[in-house]
Amino acid sequence: GYKHQCRDRCYGTCGTSCKYGASRPSCACALHGGYCCVARPYHYPYPHPRPVPLPAPAPRPAPHYPVHHPKWPHWRPHYKA
């Protein structure tokens, strides 16, 4: 996944190697319509696939307490201490 940004002349670390279609790790050059082209990677390079979003976890149901739960005896109007 590379796109080429063509210049009107060679410059920087490319030097005159673009005239011969040579390539370097720091600056890959290629002839394209008589211009020096610097290969730059895309935003999404080919070897790296797009990240797949993980499925959302199912929401856990809220704990349901019955009205006459022994933890809250004051919920029972007929409860007398």
From Swiss-Prot:
Induction cue: By estradiol injection in ovariectomized females.
Keywords tagged on the record: Nucleus
One GO CC term on file: nucleus
Cell location: Nucleus
Tissue specificity as recorded in UniProt: Expressed in oviduct, where expression levels are higher in uterine sections than in tuba sections. No expression detected in small intestine and liver (at protein level).
Name by which UniProt lists this protein: Tissue- and phase-specific nuclear protein
Species annotation: Podarcis siculus (Italian wall lizard)
Lineage, opening ranks: Eukaryota, Metazoa, Chordata, Craniata, Vertebrata
